[in-house]
A protein has these predicted regions:
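Bacterial N-terminal signal peptides that target proteins for export
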Residues: 1-9
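Extracellular acidic, Ser/Thr/Pro-rich low-complexity tracts
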Residues: 53-57, 91-93, 210, 216-218, ...
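Exposed low-complexity, polar/acidic, P/S/T/G-rich flexible segments that act as propeptides
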Residues: 167-219
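Terminal, low-complexity interaction segments
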Residues: 134-189, 236, 244-276
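Extracellular beta-strand-rich recognition modules
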Residues: 83-91, 100, 104, 153-164
Length: 276
């Protein structure tokens, strides 16, 4: 791949001559000339770029937010001014006894396989700041500002803790589902998503820690692309269990953004263009 760029008035036209094969081959040099009749224009006014050459791919970076050539390989690092957390939850089989908590830690060591490490960590109970579901109807938690719970330079772990108890009913233990979560940052550029329940770059990275794992009380808790479900064993049980869902360590000081993306101007299969 060969890449060249032309910079005009703060914008960047990027051309790429691409080829790939198993054996070496001769290729023509890509050529590109770009010029504009005006290189200094007021904001909001259209600019026409004149283009000549044989570039196979042409992309454009205007220099605007999200379209800046300087951040094409690595995104911006935005200082976080404030953090807020909210989520939605449901509780099925709610007639059976359970206890549910929302906890935060800044000193958990991130070892999800070590129950002792979880018990040793300091967990701040913030349950009372939220509204938890009491039925199978989705319940909005409300929003909590986390500024009083973070420590500069230390990662933040978010945890949902679930306790179930011996049950005589065939219906089994309650199922607590967190089916939406948003950790939001306030920055100088406005509100920005930090983490959610997903498989995208924003994933909060929840891990299930089942205190009954490997025993006859092992839970059926899961983390999927769209929810966290904490649920004890099905059917009658003679013992209870404790299950946690703990997020990855989240940076509370700086928000790393994804790289900026160019606007496509010309593709390999497209005819040559004269203006953009």
């Amino acid at each position: 791949m060969r890449t060249f760029s032309n910079i005009i008035g703060g914008g960047v036209l990027l051309l790429t001559s691409m080829f790939a094969c198993n054996d070496p081959m001769e290729v023509d040099n890509a050529e590109l000339e770009v010029w504009a009749d005006e290189v200094v224009v007021p904001a909001g006014k259209s600019v026409v770029f004149n283009i000549s050459g044989n570039a196979k791919l042409i992309s454009f970076y205007s220099g605007e937010w999200g379209n800046d050539y300087r951040y094409k390989d690595a995104g911006r690092q935005l200082p976080i001014e404030s953090l807020e957390l909210n989520f939605g939850s449901l509780l099925s089989n709610a007639k059976q006894k359970s206890e549910r908590y929302v906890l935060l830690s800044t000193d958990f060591n991130g070892n999800y396989k070590d129950i002792g490490a979880i018990q040793k960590a300091t967990w701040q109970d913030v349950t009372s700041h939220f509204t938890l579901a009491g039925s199978n109807n989705e319940t909005e938690s409300g929003t909590l500002n986390l500024d009083d719970f973070v420590i500069p330079g230390k990662p933040l772990y978010i945890a949902f803790r679930y306790l179930c108890f011996p049950i005589a009913s065939e219906s089994g233990a309650p199922s607590w589902r967190i089916n939406r979560l948003l950790l939001n940052a306030k920055t100088k550029e406005g509100d920005m998503k930090v983490a959610d329940i997903s498989t995208t770059a924003y994933t909060a990275g929840f891990n299930i820690v089942d205190f009954g794992k490997g025993t006859n009380m092992e839970s059926i808790s899961i983390v999927s692309a769209s929810l966290v479900r904490l649920q004890g064993k099905d059917g009658p049980t003679e013992q209870g269990n404790e299950v946690w869902a703990i997020s990855k360590g989240i940076d509370t000081g700086v928000l790393p953004l994804l790289p900026d993306v160019a606007v496509p101007v010309k593709g390999v299969a497209d005819a040559d263009i004269k203006q953009y």
